[in-house]
Structures are given as structure tokens and as C-alpha cells.
């Protein structure tokens, strides 16, 4: 996304692509709407903000087009008609191939899709929501809506900020310092602890890692591609090996049955 490191993440990716990859073999996704500076056109989903940010992203990435452009959050200050028209124009221009949305309410996503369909504009193909074994509120409406519309699910935080990868009482620097993760997960610790322990039990049962069990659970839910942070090579290996883990219906029930409803987080 543009806001990650104020564009630095896009610049780093662009240099890596130039040195190590063929553009045709890579799928590049980025986001718009986050604040990139002061002023009315430095954030949000107005036509001007979208066009400016996409041009800036293309320059930082050093490419001619973006494969998937996400709107990072819903913009309550811009009519959705203006946003969808601008996004459609980007697709028509060839600067963007597909559109995605992230972290919003189901009624908002349905409205955006309706506006696009009514006007003959490009609709969203991907939904990037917050979804994992410790946060399953997307199952209430969004996941079913996407399934009905044929929209791919590409959830972020599939490992709950690492909580699903380690024993409950273990410690880490991120666990201590990640304030955003604490807001997301630290209000339901009693039930979350049981779920994490059960992930560990299933991992031992199949002689795999806890990460692989957590990702395999997502595969069982019809997810297309969980977004996994790959800061180390072994994390990529875990992601790949999770494809081979086949959970039974009993496993899935065991992992899910202690879940309790959570407050909605991430949409604002």
C-alpha cells in the first residue's frame, strides 16, 4: 500500500522486480486511500486522489500497470459513484487490471458492486478482509456475499499477528510492541487461548507446524490466497506446505467450537 513506509515498500518492490523478476510472471497489488501527506487530495477516494496516487505508485514501482488495485478503506467523505467511476477509468486506461476492496461492511461492498453493475463499470474481483481462527466476523455476511458474487477472498492477518504460530505463554518482541494487534485480539483472551492450544494439538497430530494448520483451515473455507508476511524463507515454506494439510470435518469443528463473537475491528 502507498502508506506503508510512505511509499518505500513500493520502491523496494520495484527495485527487486527490476533486478530479479520478469514483470509478466509477477502479480503486483497495492492500495489507495491512505494519507500520503497534508491536504484534501492526499488521502481518500476522490477521483483526484485516486488518479494522483496510482500515478505515484506506478512511478515508485517502475511498472506500466498494477495487477490488482485495492481501496484500502471505505471513504465516508466521497460518493461511492465518484470512486467507482474513477476506478473504472483506470481499468479502461490499462493502468490497472483488476479491482479489490479491503475491510468494509458487507452493505458497503454490495452498494459499490451495485453501482458498478448499474453503470456498466468494472466491479471488484477481490475482497481483502480480516479473517483467521481468532477473528471470524467476516463469516457473518461478507464471506457469503463474496461467494455469491464470485469474488475471491484474500484475507490479511491469517495468523492473527503471530498468535496462531506460537504457544500461548511464549513471548516475542512483536507480542510486546504491536499495539494494533493488541486492539484486535487482546479482548477475548480466554477463548483465544483455547483455540491456540487446539491449533497446537492438531499440529502435533499431523506432525506439521501451527502455521500450516492455521493456513490449512483457511483453505478449507474457500479462501483464494491468504496474505502471509514472509520475512524469513521458512515462512514461505510453511505457506506452501499448508496446501498439503487436509483437515477433517472433526478437526475443523474442534478448532472452531470455542470461538466467541468479537467486536468489529479494521473497518474504520
Model regions and ranges:
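Generic structural signal for well-ordered alpha-helices
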Residues: 10, 14, 54-58, 84-88, ...
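Conserved, mostly hydrophobic/aromatic
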Residues: 1, 13, 28, 57, ...
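A short acidic, helix-capping loop that chelates divalent metal ions and anchors anionic groups
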Residues: 35-41, 164, 237-238
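Aromatic-lined glycan-binding groove of carbohydrate-active enzymes
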Residues: 137-174, 209
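Conserved short secondary-structure transition element at the edge of the structured enzyme core
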Residues: 91, 158, 177, 187-245
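Active-site-proximal loop/turn and secondary-structure-junction residues that shape catalytic pockets
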Residues: 4, 32-34, 72-75, 103-105, ...
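Glycine/proline-rich, positively charged
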Residues: 37-137, 141, 148
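N-terminal binding-site loop/beta-alpha segment at the start of enzyme catalytic domains
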Residues: 1-27, 92, 267
